[in-house]
């Protein structure tokens, strides 16, 4: 059985499968959920709250306002001025300075 997470949105309740989430985009108290089928869901929850409900390793926080599903990660660029990820959907998202340092350290571990 797949893990279903149930949320209330503007039109009622929505059931999400964490593995089908492409990325999250937070804006204050709201979070836009982008699914792999192209659907978008707006929730009145913070990105931190949603990340707390997800199984470990499902989503990776790359900045204050973005989290991605590492399954759909195609490329990571960690140069001094250019820090971003490219997703399978073709989207390009900036990585924060602090998260870039964490990602560098993780990539150097054996």
Predicted regions, residues:
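Basic, polyanion-interacting recognition surfaces, primarily
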Residues: 1-110
